[in-house]
C-alpha cells in the first residue's frame, strides 16, 4: 500500500487522539487500481485490432503498471503511429516501408483501421465518453463503498 496520507495526532490538555489514515490510503489504492484497469477496458473497443497482438501487448504493459496511475495507451513500436492515426513514411522514399535505420515521418494521410470502431487518440475519445462515470466510481471507492 502506498502512503498517500500520513497519520497524525491531536493533543490537548486532557486528551490525545491518534488518527490513522490506513483505511483512506487503502481506499485510494483500490480506487486507483480500479481506474487504471477500467480505462484500459474502456479503450479496447476503440483501438486498432488487426491481429489482436497490439491490444494484448498494450494490456500487458498497462497491467504491469496498474495502480500507479500510469496507463499505456499504445505499446511500441507501433503504438505511436496507430495512436496518432496518421500514415508514417520513410522521408527519402515516401514509402510506409522504411529503409533500415531510417526514421519515419508523419504525413497528413489518415490511417485506415481494420476495426470500424477504431479511432485515433482513443484514450482522449474514451476519456471524453467515460470521465463522469470514472469520477463517480472512483469517489465511491474512496468512500469505501
Where are these regions (language model features)?
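His/Glu-rich zincin catalytic helix
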Residues: 80-86
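Short, Lys/Arg-rich flexible segments
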Residues: 1-79, 91-145
Amino acid at each position: 500500500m502506498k502512503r498517500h496520507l500520513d497519520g497524525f495526532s491531536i493533543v490537548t490538555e486532557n486528551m490525545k487522539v491518534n488518527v490513522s489514515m490506513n483505511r483512506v490510503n487503502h481506499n485510494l489504492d483500490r480506487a486507483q487500481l480500479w481506474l487504471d484497469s477500467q480505462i484500459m477496458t474502456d479503450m479496447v473497443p476503440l483501438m486498432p485490432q488487426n491481429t489482436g497482438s497490439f491490444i494484448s501487448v498494450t494490456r500487458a504493459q498497462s497491467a504491469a503498471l496498474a495502480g500507479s496511475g500510469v496507463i499505456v495507451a499504445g505499446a511500441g513500436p507501433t503504438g505511436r503511429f496507430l495512436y496518432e492515426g496518421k500514415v508514417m513514411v520513410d522521408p527519402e522514399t515516401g514509402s510506409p516501408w522504411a529503409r533500415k535505420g531510417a526514421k519515419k515521418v508523419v504525413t497528413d494521410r489518415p490511417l485506415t483501421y481494420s476495426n470500424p470502431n477504431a479511432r485515433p487518440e482513443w484514450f482522449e475519445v474514451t476519456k471524453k465518453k467515460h470521465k463522469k462515470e470514472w469520477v463517480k466510481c472512483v469517489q465511491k471507492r474512496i468512500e469505501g463503498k
